[in-house]
């Protein structure tokens, strides 16, 4: 894997905005399994029945409000040709869900019609059965889709299903491959080594982690090759829900010379996660500061706030509170005509720990 990024992103990311998780649906018959736009995306050939309780529209078919996802036609053809057999029927996309068992308290009572299997096996699998990731087959049976046991994946907690949208329980996978093929592919990733051989858990099945990870490797064809199972056309798409959005990721055709990367979490990937975390932290700190410290920062000098937070982070203040205190102290010093550089040097002589320095700076400048 080269150290530099390529100049092209090899992912299409389709977003469905303003997702409204389902409620108990007492006013709909039959109840929906997913909001209509998501249902039409994940089950494109699966008709959504009209609401029989809506007498004005009970004979109307559902229509998506969002544009269709952008799909690389060559990739689509690759998958279709790979899974087409001698029969006249075309292969259909299957929907799988990777469940984070750590987020549900009732795993031992869960009994599903579809296949369900922990990505951890053997003694380790037994020891981690309550916290492991599980691959689940989401059955394409009409009764199951609308009233079945996986009900709740797109619902509010108040709907009182086993599953819910709000807890980010896992990720969706679109694939033409059978359960065992997808399962064996995914088993490669929950535990990875870094470049120094240290093992750690890689929670790619957490929607937030997958969202960040795909952004990190979007320009790394070798990483995408391995993660999607490109040679064998295993993963057609990843899907995930975050907040009020649903993301659907498909792969573009990769350069012919692309080889799959080793299954290692490289330093640049780890740095990518750190960068994403910092950007989110900075955004939160900016919003908080503008609200709580209007005497120091406003929309007019928001750029200075961003610079000062970034400066504090790069100076190693590390903790959120110490980065915030650094930005507050610097702006207060500027407003009061105090030489902040000299003040910081003076404080650093007696306070080597970043948190102690930040507290002392705020104390000297009377910031609470």
Residue locations for each model-derived region?
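Short, well-ordered amphipathic alpha-helical segments that serve as non-catalytic structural scaffolds
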Residues: 1-2, 206
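Short, mixed-charge low-complexity intrinsically disordered segments
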Residues: 2-29
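A contiguous, surface-oriented mixed alpha/beta subdomain in the mid-to-C-terminal portion of proteins
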Residues: 28-130, 135-145, 149-158, 162-368
